């Protein structure tokens, strides 16, 4: 489907969970001849990341309202109005055929600006619980899509766009069938790390001894502390790194993952075809719990809410999973994934632009 001459504005910002799926769709449409620009904020990760991907970015001034004091809330209508005016001016200049909102504060004023100019608004919700911005924008959107069932009652479930190197991994049967030796446990705390994983997993390693080998991504500034924790537990042989640059290679190495359950993480693990122990971040709307639930229901994962994530519980769970069990879980994870999510979202963008 050629997009020659078509223009898309992607609205996404704040976190990788919003930005990376937007980039996947943007690159897919650029390859079809679309011209793509990005709407973001100058002080969040998209300001650096998007230009590195060869996409021009425009900025509006907006920030979140959650947890702000009374002064900030009173000033919010004026700030939103100003951001809406900025977004309108940017869109009048660029003249997009369609805008794609992937979440983050920037989507609110951006979506309203597009709607006020008669530009179709397409939304994608990455999480199992809809964010505040997308809840508002759904009322005026041309098309609403969701990664997991339940965020919106009637929205089409299309999965989360995932990086191509993860999608290109061999299927679980090819990757895991001949493996022997200790179970390979990949622990992923994200860029900021997860203190509960950093504190608990060295003690789990001590309980399991040589039945496991662990690669532990500790997060920024925590590598030495976590290495010391493994050494103190009598387990200095395990690998600890601050970051993992090549997640696809890490997934290919692993037999099982222990991690938080951000939307993109859950979707990547399903696409890779890996069993998981998910430890949802404790948030009042339990967003990460709802992200992980479909994989637990599919028999591909186990969820431990943070208070239940104890050394004994995790050690006994890992010890109880044979290689045969892990392979079955891996195949169920892959079966629950949506490998063509990027194409599905891109097709809806194309459809909205033509309507």
From Swiss-Prot:
Keywords: Cell cycle, Cell division, Cell inner membrane, Cell membrane, Cell shape, Cell wall biogenesis/degradation, Glycosyltransferase, Membrane, Peptidoglycan synthesis, Transferase. InterPro entries: GlcNAc_MurG, Glyco_trans_28_C, GlycoTrans_28_N. Pathway: Cell wall biogenesis; peptidoglycan biosynthesis. Its EC number is 2.4.1.227. One of its GO terms (biological process) is cell division. It catalyses: di-trans,octa-cis-undecaprenyl diphospho-N-acetyl-alpha-D-muramoyl-L-alanyl-D-glutamyl-meso-2,6-diaminopimeloyl-D-alanyl-D-alanine + UDP-N-acetyl-alpha-D-glucosamine = di-trans,octa-cis-undecaprenyl diphospho-[N-acetyl-alpha-D-glucosaminyl-(1->4)]-N-acetyl-alpha-D-muramoyl-L-alanyl-D-glutamyl-meso-2,6-diaminopimeloyl-D-alanyl-D-alanine + UDP + H(+). CDD domains: GT28_MurG. One of its GO terms (molecular function) is UDP-N-acetyl-D-glucosamine:N-acetylmuramoyl-L-alanyl-D-glutamyl-meso-2,6-diaminopimelyl-D-alanyl-D-alanine-diphosphoundecaprenol 4-beta-N-acetylglucosaminlytransferase activity. It is a peripheral membrane protein. Its main location: membrane. UDP-N-acetyl-alpha-D-glucosamine binds at residues 15-17, 127, 163, 191, 244, 263-268, 288. Coiled coil: none annotated. Pfam families: Glyco_tran_28_C, Glyco_transf_28. It is found in: Cell inner membrane. One of its GO terms (cellular component) is plasma membrane. It comes from the Bacteria. HAMAP family: MurG. Cell wall formation. Catalyzes the transfer of a GlcNAc subunit on undecaprenyl-pyrophosphoryl-MurNAc-pentapeptide (lipid intermediate I) to form undecaprenyl-pyrophosphoryl-MurNAc-(pentapeptide)GlcNAc (lipid intermediate II). Belongs to the glycosyltransferase 28 family. MurG subfamily. This is UDP-N-acetylglucosamine--N-acetylmuramyl-(pentapeptide) pyrophosphoryl-undecaprenol N-acetylglucosamine transferase. It comes from Escherichia fergusonii (strain ATCC 35469 / DSM 13698 / CCUG 18766 / IAM 14443 / JCM 21226 / LMG 7866 / NBRC 102419 / NCTC 12128 / CDC 0568-73). The lineage of its organism: Bacteria, Pseudomonadati, Pseudomonadota, Gammaproteobacteria, Enterobacterales. The gene is murG.
């Amino acid at each position: 489907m050629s997009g020659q001459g078509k223009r898309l504005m992607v609205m996404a910002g704040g976190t990788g969970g919003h930005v990376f799926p937007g980039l996947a769709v943007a690159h897919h449409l650029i390859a079809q001849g679309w011209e793509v620009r990005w709407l973001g904020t100058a002080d969040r990760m998209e300001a650096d990341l998007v230009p590195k991907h060869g996409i021009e970015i425009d900025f509006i001034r907006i920030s979140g309202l959650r947890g702000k004091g009374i002064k900030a809330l009173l000033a919010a209508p004026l700030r939103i109005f100003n951001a809406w005016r900025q977004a309108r001016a940017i869109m009048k200049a660029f003249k997009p055929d369609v805008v794609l909102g992937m979440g983050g504060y920037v989507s609110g004023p951006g979506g309203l600006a597009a709607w006020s100019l008669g530009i179709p608004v397409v939304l994608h919700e990455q999480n199992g619980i809809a964010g505040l911005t997308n809840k508002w924008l759904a009322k005026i959107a041309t098309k609403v899509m969701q990664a997991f069932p339940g965020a919106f009652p009637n929205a089409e479930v299309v999965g989360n766009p995932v990086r191509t190197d993860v999608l290109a991994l061999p299927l679980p049967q090819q990757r895991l069938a001949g493996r022997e030796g200790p179970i390979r446990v990949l622990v992923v705390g994200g860029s900021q790390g997860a203190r509960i994983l950093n504190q608990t997993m060295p003690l789990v390693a001590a309980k399991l001894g040589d039945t496991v080998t662990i690669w532990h991504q500790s997060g920024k500034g925590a590598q030495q502390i976590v290495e010391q924790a493994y050494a103190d537990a009598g387990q200095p042989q395990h690998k600890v790194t601050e970051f993992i640059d090549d997640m696809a290679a890490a997934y290919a190495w692993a037999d099982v993952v222990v991690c938080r359950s951000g939307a993109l993480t859950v979707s990547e693990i399903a696409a890779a075809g890996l069993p998981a122990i998910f430890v949802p971040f404790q948030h009042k709307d339990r967003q990460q719990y709802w992200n992980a639930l479909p994989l637990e229901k599919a028999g591909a994962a186990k969820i431990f809410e943070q208070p239940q994530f104890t050394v004994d519980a995790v050690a006994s769970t890992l010890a109880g999973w044979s290689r045969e069990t892990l392979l079955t879980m891996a195949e169920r994870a892959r079966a629950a994934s949506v490998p063509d999510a990027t194409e599905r979202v891109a097709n809806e963008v194309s459809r909205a632009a033509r309507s």
